[in-house]
């Protein structure tokens, strides 16, 4: 809905950006299960530049606790191994030809709790981002009302709509967090 120069769909889009960022961050958290997204942040020194691992290899999950990295260029195998070791994911690569296998070790209880704390930190950052978007929207509404571009009633109604969108987005953040927390704590 657009009133004056206020567009609530733009606020929704910005809030969804925060939830997408959260999904991406949570996807990178290592749980006890193998996931190709675990290797997304890995950067490989390839051809004189840093490249994401997915640009030099194919990542697959043949078993629940095993990642398989098929390196396309045989000369890149050592660089990919080094990048995986240097990524601080706690994975030790074993190479068979052009395939690098990564066993995902079991997580102990202490590490699980640490990961849950990290997930909570990510979720809180997403909530803060959503609240910033809400504040921007409310500030815009106040400015429009002050400049007599919208009525006070419209401003209050739109502010209520902004709050509803904010509440829904924060609820989505909480659901993402709860799902990830359950995944982490599942032994």
UniProtKB/Swiss-Prot annotation:
Compartments where located: Cytoplasm
Database matches in Pfam families: RRF
Gene Ontology biological-process entries: cytoplasmic translational termination
Coarse class of the protein's main subcellular location: cytoplasm
GO molecular function: ribosomal large subunit binding
GO cellular component, one term: cytosol
Keywords carried by this UniProt record: Cytoplasm, Protein biosynthesis
InterPro entries: Ribosome_recyc_fac, Ribosome_recyc_fac_dom, RRF_sf
SUPFAM superfamilies the UniProt entry points to: Ribosome recycling factor, RRF
Keyword Cytoplasm on entry: yes
Similarity remark: Belongs to the RRF family.
NCBIfam families, per the entry: frr (TIGR00496)
Function: Responsible for the release of ribosomes from messenger RNA at the termination of protein biosynthesis. May increase the efficiency of translation by recycling ribosomes from one round of translation to another.
Protein name, per record: Ribosome-recycling factor
Source species of the chain: Rhodopseudomonas palustris (strain BisA53)
């Amino acid at each position: 809905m657009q009133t004056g120069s206020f567009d609530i769909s733009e606020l929704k889009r910005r809030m969804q950006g925060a939830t997408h960022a959260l999904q991406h961050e949570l996807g990178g958290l290592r749980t006890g299960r193998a996931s190709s997204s675990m290797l997304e942040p890995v950067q490989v020194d390839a051809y004189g530049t840093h490249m994401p691992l997915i640009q030099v290899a194919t990542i697959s999950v043949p078993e629940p606790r095993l990642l398989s990295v098929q390196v396309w260029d045989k000369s890149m195998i050592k660089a990919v191994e080094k990048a995986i070791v240097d990524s601080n994911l706690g994975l030790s690569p074993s190479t068979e030809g052009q395939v690098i296998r990564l066993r995902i070790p079991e997580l102990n209880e202490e590490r699980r709790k640490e990961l849950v704390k990290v997930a909570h930190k990510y979720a809180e950052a997403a909530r803060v981002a959503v609240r910033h978007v809400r504040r921007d929207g409310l500030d815009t509404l106040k400015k429009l009302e002050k400049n007599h571009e919208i009525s006070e009633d419209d401003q209050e109604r739109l502010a209520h709509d902004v709050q509803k969108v904010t509440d829904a987005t924060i609820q989505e953040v909480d659901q993402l967090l709860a799902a990830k927390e359950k995944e982490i704590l599942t032994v």
